[in-house]
Swiss-Prot record:
Swiss-Prot/TrEMBL catalytic activity: 2-(N(omega)-L-arginino)succinate = fumarate + L-arginine
UniProt key word DNA-binding: no
Species name: Shigella sonnei (strain Ss046)
Family annotation (CDD domains): Argininosuccinate_lyase (cd01359)
Record's protein name: Argininosuccinate lyase
């Protein structure tokens, strides 16, 4: 059933109809469309378009339809309706007859779809926030269980300074906390109702839009009808949050892919999140993590695509805006799936402490400690930096770690070096000295874990 047609003397070409129809993807707004229609029916009572009895009849029919949709959503795609709005209205008319044709009074598909999409976004943000916090909790739990797992930290993929696996986990907790904050901020801005703005100029009926917004669970109603029907900032904001969030998950995946290699050997992934090779029997591939990393690109593409769709649109509504949904649906679905999958990866991960410790003791990760030791003895840092660089070259030449160089050899580089240098060069000392807020010392890591646990509840 088309919601328009009186103006036309020819039927739409079937090829155009298929090109124009959006039911194949906006069917996902069915529940929101029905909920919005119930609220609109109540508003029509307040302006005398519907009687209380008519509204009750419509609400009952819409409630039955809502249950039908939840029980068998695939029925929607069996229809040739243009979009979800015409499908819902057609089903309503089937149930209540001519009364169903009164429901659209004073309403446009422009404010209707804007409302539906915002309601869907609110529901989906709630799911994303839950999944985000679940992953944060999984990371905090993994950190708590691995506070003593010393491993190399990297810059430029070169061993830099010793850290702990717990500290690594907590770095991603911080990223996810920012993602959570971005979602909460976006939610505040999208929590305004456009329903009652009509096609672009507002509705001709004196409907209390603030009351209507409250019925739908919005914090308030929008203030400008022209902006309301053409606003898709909430789509851009959520796509941006998803793009940033997926970058974080991609980096998380890349780190663990590297940690899982035979060359690093810091972790072993569970069989539940890995796959084998059709040719090589020995293979255990980190497919879950590789897919998280790979799916990042499609989310970035959705954001870029939506930016380009909106950049040249005049006010108010244009059919281009139909392109807002597929990318948004896919991007947020992808982000949600990847959050769940990242948590599943952590659920069965094994941290190989001996190998982590061995790697942390290699690569002269304690060189900075020797420089700090010299500074404490009164040597200017730049000079100390140069001295330690020369000492590292000699240690490499001899194939020894710094702490295995005899004192007389170390003193060739600086006479201020004494026997007290050796405890300073231990891995534990390297960690203990990073005791400022945010550092890798056991005390700071324990405090960070406690803070995250309290925040997450």
């Amino acid at each position: 059933m088309a919601l328009w047609g009186g103006r036309f003397t020819q039927a739409a070409d079937q090829r155009f109809k298929q090109f124009n129809d959006s039911l194949r993807f906006d069917y996902r707004l069915a529940e929101q469309d029905i909920v919005g229609s119930v609220a609109w029916s109540k508003a029509l009572v307040t302006v005398g378009v519907l009687t209380a009895e008519e509204q009750a009849q419509l609400e009952e029919a819409l409630s039955v339809l809502l249950e039908d949709v939840r029980a068998r959503p695939q029925q929607i795609l069996e229809s040739d309706a243009e979009d979800i709005h015409s499908w819902v209205e057609g089903k309503l008319i089937d149930k209540v007859g001519q009364l169903g044709k009164k429901l659209h009074t004073g309403r446009s598909r422009n404010d209707q779809v804007a409302t539906d999409l915002k309601l869907w976004c609110k529901d989906t943000v709630s799911e994303l926030l839950t999944a985000n916090r679940q992953l944060q909790s999984a990371l905090v739990e993994t950190a708590q269980n691995n506070q003593d797992a010393v491993m190399p930290g990297y810059t430029h993929l070169q061993r830099a300074q010793p850290v702990t696996f717990a500290h690594w986990c907590l770095a991603y907790v911080e990223m996810l906390a920012r993602d959570e904050s971005r979602l909460q901020d976006a939610l505040k801005r999208l929590d305004v109702s456009p329903l009652g703005c009509g096609a672009l100029a507002g509705t001709a009926y004196e409907i209390d839009r603030e009351q209507l917004a409250g019925w739908l669970g919005f914090a308030s109603a929008t203030r400008n009808s022209l902006d309301s029907v053409s606003d898709r900032d909430h789509v851009l904001e959520l796509l941006s949050a998803a793009a940033i969030g997926m970058v974080h998950l991609s980096r998380f995946a890349e780190d663990l892919i590297f940690f899982n290699t035979g060359e690093a050997g810091f972790v072993e992934l569970s069989d539940r999140v890995t796959s084998g090779s059709s040719l090589m029997p020995q293979k255990k591939n980190p497919d879950a993590l590789e897919l998280i990393r790979g799916k990042c690109g499609r989310v970035q593409g959705a954001l870029t695509g939506m930016m380009m769709t909106l950049k040249g649109l005049p006010l108010a509504y244009n059919k281009d805006m139909q392109e807002d949904k597929e990318g948004l649906f896919d991007a947020l679905d992808t982000w949600l799936d990847c959050l769940h999958m990242a948590a599943l990866v952590l659920d069965g991960i094994q941290v190989k402490r001996p190998r982590c410790q061995e790697a942390a003791q290699q690569g002269y990760a304690n060189a900075t400690e020797l420089a700090d030791y010299l500074v404490a003895k009164g040597v200017p840092f730049r000079e100390a930096h140069h001295i330690v660089g020369e000492a590292v070259v000699e240690a490499i030449r001899q194939g020894k770690p710094l702490e295995d160089l005899p004192l007389d050899e170390l003193q060739k580089f600086s006479p201020v070096i004494g026997e007290d240098v050796y405890p300073i060069l231990s891995l534990q000392s390297c960690l203990d000295k990073r005791a400022a807020k945010g550092g890798v010392s056991p005390q700071q890591v324990a405090q960070a874990i406690a803070f995250a646990q309290a925040r997450l509840g």
